[in-house]
């Protein structure tokens, strides 16, 4: 049953990709979707069997690498962390498959699309279930390649080509550091198996652990779109909307967070890595929230919202609250997938226009889309009793409950980020559904409310976004829970803060995020309704224009990368390639070797002058040299060097 969970999506991908012409569009949709649904049902069963009953399971298929002390198996490990990650990955993937049947119904390449979706899901399952870093790295590379294929699905569009290449190359930076971290692990621990590495970690030097942790953190930064390696995330919106929901809700962007959670027995011994995670997540949260407030593309706003929530998860990891990071990851997967698919329903209904300034007044035309986006937004801003409330607010409380200066500052920074999250959520809802119509008349005449394949996944995800957090909060973050008793997480005793967060936090700081959320929601709607002209007038002033340009252009980070880093690297690479090519081909390679042999033969040939005295001189020199060889013990290499020097000297003369 466990191997069926892993390999059934791969089988669906192969059938749809290689035999798509034989089975047709409906056959590809039916086979891939049914295989993913079966896999999801088995994963839910395993969630109860492995997670609730605390019965971890390891499956070793065959020996992959056997070289002296390095022994790496192709094996899979199912524990509470694995089955918890499989739940959002497979539920969202199955709903995206169903949604895509309706959303991509007019696309001529359905077989290829569903093959890519299933292959993406398979690679994510490999990443999550691997029992060693090398197999997990295979999954990381696999989801990177599949994301390139999916973002570039409409490969005739130049923007899709550029975005997919940007995403691929940005992730290669993180993968490079992840590879370096794996090399250090092999060199220091002698293996890449989780159990071996985590068992030996307490006995190693902290500098080694810090170096490995930083490499793993940079690898996670690329996959989970943390500041510095975040530029690919909004550009990946060029792919179809179901792809955006799959990549940015439950799969690729969570891979980096999962890597850090899985490596908790390693990074817990390095306070440097934990403090880096704490501040990296805080800066990412407020940075992405500010940028999201000034975007006009509905999918890009949701993408920056994803980046902000990933920053929250990294904050939780920096606080050593790994179960809290996992709980927020699972909750976030459901309501963020709901946001993306709801945005896709709106885009699908208004002639594929993504600028929400050209929407307005869609509430009477799309009541279901309005309802589900309202539910998802309420969960995103952590309104009480929605799923996001039980995890997001607890992360903020944990930051304040650690009672260190860094964590206290991070609490206020993340709270400000949550305030901006509220503002852009209200902005999207207001400009899309509530304000006066701003789009072409044809968009409203031809509004399509979607079919059962589009609406059913939205309803299911809305139910998860409302109830999942409440139903599972005691399982994931309850003080008496035994869900993680199999020790998949390791928290150093000096980093344990759950009790302080639960009992020592002032009520004011528990209610502060909720107060800001409600207040800013009211202020945002009132300001847009009654004082909108003031904002427009300020925007046309020099100060307002400069502020808006800075935030709308994403703090000019892409401009800096393109003009100062990318160009420099390209020039340096060009010069290096030129020098190495000249050195390897013209001096040492085939051309250089041929040239040197020809020169040597000419030097030897020039000794034949036709003059008797010259030949007599050669004979005399050779005789003297031979006599000396009888009495001197000279290495043969030195003799060859002397002969080469003599021939070179003669040639110069």
From Swiss-Prot:
It is a multi-pass membrane protein. One of its GO terms (biological process) is electron transport coupled proton transport. Its EC number is 7.1.1.2. It is found in: Mitochondrion inner membrane. GO terms for molecular function: NADH dehydrogenase (ubiquinone) activity. Keywords: Electron transport, Membrane, Mitochondrion, Mitochondrion inner membrane, NAD, Respiratory chain, Translocase, Transmembrane, Transmembrane helix, Transport, Ubiquinone. Core subunit of the mitochondrial membrane respiratory chain NADH dehydrogenase (Complex I) that is believed to belong to the minimal assembly required for catalysis. Complex I functions in the transfer of electrons from NADH to the respiratory chain. The immediate electron acceptor for the enzyme is believed to be ubiquinone. Belongs to the complex I subunit 5 family. PANTHER family: NADH-UBIQUINONE OXIDOREDUCTASE CHAIN 5 (PTHR42829:SF2). This is NADH-ubiquinone oxidoreductase chain 5. It comes from Trichophyton rubrum.
């Amino acid at each position: 049953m466990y191997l069926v969970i892993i390999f059934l999506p791969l089988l669906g991908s192969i059938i749809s990709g290689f035999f798509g012409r034989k089975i047709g569009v409906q056959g590809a949709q039916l086979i891939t979707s049914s295989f993913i649904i079966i896999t999801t049902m088995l994963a839910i069963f395993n969630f109860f069997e492995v997670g609730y009953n605390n019965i971890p399971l390891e499956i070793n298929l065959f020996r992959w690498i056997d070289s002296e002390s390095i022994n790496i198996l192709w094996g899979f490990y199912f524990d509470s962390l694995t089955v918890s990650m499989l739940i959002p990955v497979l539920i969202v993937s199955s709903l995206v498959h169903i949604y895509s049947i309706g959303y991509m119904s007019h696309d001529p390449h359905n077989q290829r699309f569903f093959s890519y979706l299933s292959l993406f899901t398979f690679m994510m399952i490999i990443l999550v279930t691997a029992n060693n870093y090398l197999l997990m790295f295979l999954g990381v590379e696999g989801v990177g390649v599949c994301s390139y294929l999916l973002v570039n699905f409409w490969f005739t569009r130049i923007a899709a080509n550029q975005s997919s290449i940007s995403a691929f190359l940005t992730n290669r930076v993180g993968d490079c550091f992840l590879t370096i971290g794996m090399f250090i692990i092999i060199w220091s621990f002698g293996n890449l198996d989780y159990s071996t590495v985590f068992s030996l970690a307490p006995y190693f030097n902290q500098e080694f652990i810090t170096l490995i942790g930083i490499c793993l953190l940079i690898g996670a930064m690329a996959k989970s779109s943390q500041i510095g390696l975040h530029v690919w995330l909004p550009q990946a919106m060029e792919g179809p909307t179901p792809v955006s929901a799959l990549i940015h809700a439950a799969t690729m962007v969570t891979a980096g967070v999962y890597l850090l959670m899985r490596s908790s027995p390693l990074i817990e011994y390095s306070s440097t890595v934990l403090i880096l995670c704490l501040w990296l997540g805080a800066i990412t949260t407020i940075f992405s929230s500010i940028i999201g407030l000034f975007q006009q593309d509905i999918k890009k706003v949701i993408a920056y919202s994803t980046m902000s929530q990933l920053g929250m998860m990294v904050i939780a990891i920096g606080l050593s609250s790994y179960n809290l990071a996992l709980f927020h990851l699972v909750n976030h997967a459901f309501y963020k997938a709901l946001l993306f698919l709801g945005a896709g329903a709106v885009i699908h209904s208004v002639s594929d226009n993504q600028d929400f300034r050209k929407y307005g007044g869609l509430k009477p035309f799309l009541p279901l889309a309005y309802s589900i986006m309202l539910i998802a937004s309420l969960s995103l801003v952590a309104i009480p009793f929605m799923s996001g409330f039980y995890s997001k607010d607890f992360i903020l409380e944990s930051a304040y409950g650690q009672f260190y200066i860094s964590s206290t500052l991070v609490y206020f920074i993340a709270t400000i980020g949550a305030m901006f999250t509220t503002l852009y959520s209200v902005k999207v809802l207001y400009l899309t559904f509530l304000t006066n119509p701003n789009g072409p008349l044809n968009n409203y005449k031809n509004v399509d409310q979607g079919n059962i394949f589009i609406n059913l996944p939205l309803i299911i995800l809305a139910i998860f976004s409302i109830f999942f957090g409440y139903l599972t909060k005691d399982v994931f973050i309850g003080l008496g829970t035994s869900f993680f008793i199999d020790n998949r997480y390791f928290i150093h005793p000096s980093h344990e803060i759950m009790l302080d967060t639960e009992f020592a936090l002032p009520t004011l700081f528990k209610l502060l995020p909720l107060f800001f959320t409600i207040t800013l929601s009211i202020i945002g709607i009132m300001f847009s309704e009654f004082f909108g002209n003031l904002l427009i007038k300020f925007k046309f002033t020099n100060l307002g224009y400069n502020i808006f340009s800075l935030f709308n252009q994403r703090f000019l980070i892409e401009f800096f990368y393109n003009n100062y880093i990318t160009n420099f690297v390209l020039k340096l690479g060009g010069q290096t390639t030129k020098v190495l090519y000249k050195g390897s081909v013209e001096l040492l390679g085939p051309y250089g070797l041929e040239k040197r042999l020809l020169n040597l033969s000419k030097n030897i040939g020039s000794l034949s002058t036709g003059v008797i005295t010259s030949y007599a001189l050669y004979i005399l020199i050779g005789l003297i040299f031979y006599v000396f060889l009888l009495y001197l013990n000279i290495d043969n290499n030195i003799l060859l060097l002397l002969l080469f020097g003599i021939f070179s000297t003669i040639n110069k003369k």
